[in-house]
Every structure is written in structure tokens, then in C-alpha cells.
UniProtKB/Swiss-Prot annotation:
Transit peptide: 1-29
Species, as recorded: Pongo abelii (Sumatran orangutan)
Major site of localization recorded for this protein: mitochondrion
Gene Ontology CC: mitochondrial matrix; mitochondrion
Alphabetized Gene3D superfamilies for the sequence: Flavinator of succinate dehydrogenase (1.10.150.250)
Its biological purpose: Plays an essential role in the assembly of succinate dehydrogenase (SDH), an enzyme complex (also referred to as respiratory complex II) that is a component of both the tricarboxylic acid (TCA) cycle and the mitochondrial electron transport chain, and which couples the oxidation of succinate to fumarate with the reduction of ubiquinone (coenzyme Q) to ubiquinol. Required for flavinylation (covalent attachment of FAD) of the flavoprotein subunit SDHA of the SDH catalytic dimer.
GO BP terms in the entry: mitochondrial electron transport, succinate to ubiquinone; mitochondrial respiratory chain complex II assembly; protein-FAD linkage; tricarboxylic acid cycle
InterPro entries reported for this sequence: SDH (IPR005631), SDH_sf (IPR036714), SDHAF2 (IPR028882)
Name of this chain's protein: Succinate dehydrogenase assembly factor 2, mitochondrial
């Protein structure tokens, strides 16, 4: 009969030690509040802004080189929303743009330091600065409205570049 007593004593000790190990963790995590996004009192003192070199228009490249560069830069944005929006826009409009329009598009996608700004301007969530209010921005805004209700889930394949012109 001593056996069950020893067994129950050791199991109680094991249960106690397990409880004492877990209880501090449970008490700490149950009272923590986690926030997502900015809080109203955020001073943003910990925010580091890396200065980018100012955008300069490239005057020494051919139209075809500029189109190829802008196609690449439209596809490789660093944020999925702009990769999809700008690469599909480039597929539809880049080949038909004049040199002036290419320069405006170049400035639009390369001068702003924050890609979210471009997205917000294109979707009309925020007003664009006056310098970007031009015919290319109007084309981009119209394209972003997706009036034809196309499915835009990813950037287009590059096979269209190798098709013969119609």
C-alpha cells in the first residue's frame, strides 16, 4: 500500500513542477496586448529614412532602351500591388507611348521615394502632387479602375514581347 502513496506523491510533485514552470508564461502572455499598425501616440522616433539619390532624367538612351528599362522597372517594384498594376499597365500602354509620355512615366515611377505613394495616387486614395498630374497619370488612373473587370492576380508573362506585331 505504500506504493500508491509514493506514486501519487511523485505525480503531484510532477504536476506542481509543470504548473509552476508554465504559470509565469501563461500569466505574462495572457495580459499582453499586441497592436497592428501605428498607434496615435507613435512619435516615429525609431523610424529611419534612408535618403535616395535624386531622380535624374536619362537623356542619353534610345527610345527602345527606355521602353525596355521602363518595362523592367514596372515589373520589379518591391511591392506586389505595384508589380501587378504597373506591369499590366506597361504591357498595355508602353509600346504606344510617345517619347514625352515615356519621360513622364519614367518620372512617375522613379522619382517618388515611396512606392505606396504611386499606388495611392493611381487608385485615387490620395491626391497626387501637381508635378505628377499629367496625361500618363490619367491613363494609369483609368487603367487602375479596371473598367473591363479583368482578372489581375499577377504580372503578365513576358511571351507577348516575342509575338509578331499585328
Amino acid at each position: 500500500m505504500a506504493m500508491p502513496t509514493v506514486f501519487s506523491t511523485s505525480s503531484r510533485m510532477l504536476a506542481l513542477s509543470r504548473h509552476s514552470l508554465l504559470s509565469p508564461l501563461l500569466s505574462v502572455t495572457s495580459f499582453r496586448c499586441f497592436y497592428r499598425g501605428d498607434s496615435p501616440a507613435d512619435s516615429q522616433k525609431d523610424l529611419i529614412e534612408i535618403p535616395l539619390p535624386p531622380w535624374q532624367e536619362r537623356t542619353d538612351e534610345s527610345i527602345e532602351t527606355k521602353r525596355a528599362r521602363l518595362l523592367y522597372e514596372s515589373r520589379k517594384r518591391g511591392m506586389l500591388e505595384n508589380c501587378i498594376l504597373l506591369s499590366l499597365f506597361a504591357k498595355e500602354h508602353l509600346q504606344h507611348m510617345t517619347e514625352k509620355q515615356l519621360n513622364l512615366y519614367d518620372r512617375l515611377i522613379n522619382e517618388p521615394s515611396n512606392d505606396w505613394d504611386i499606388y495611392y495616387w493611381a487608385t485615387e486614395a490620395k491626391p497626387a502632387p501637381e508635378v505628377f498630374e499629367n496625361e500618363v497619370m490619367a491613363l494609369l488612373r483609368d487603367f487602375a479602375k479596371n473598367k473591363n473587370k479583368e482578372q489581375r492576380l499577377r504580372a503578365p508573362d513576358l511571351e507577348y514581347l516575342f509575338e509578331k506585331p499585328r
